[in-house]
Amino acid sequence: MVLAAGAAAPDFALSDQYGSETVLSDLLQDGPVALVFVPFAFSRICTSEFAELSAHADLFAERSVQLVGITVDSVWTLRAWAEQEGFSFPILSDFWPHGEVARACGALDERMGAAARATVVVGRDGRVAASFSSGAGEARPLAAYREAVSALPRA
């Protein structure tokens, strides 16, 4: 089960698509963070979800929310995917230990061996402000992001 509102978000360090280390607690110094877990790079639904989020970056900017994608794919796969699709936000590799961050956030589908479609919005205080998920074959609606982001205090 995905971390519920009020739960402490686990701190972590993962590499982004360019190999740079990203630490959640460092990101939180600049404001809330939306962790968007998807199963696999280059898959149809994952690509369409990230494209939609890139196109609606203003939704997150209005509340100073940093958008961060997370998959169990390798850094090299994520770089190729991000460059091909032109995503406007960092994508982190939860490749090894395989799915460790997704598991800690309650967002790992153990049967599939990949992240589930889950979103965890973490407030500056390191606590989950909102979370939601959808089935493996279902994109999360943009309205769910609007609702989650609107639960945050204005910057």
Tell me the role of every PLM-derived stretch:
Residues M1-A155:
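Chalcogenol-based redox active-site neighborhoods
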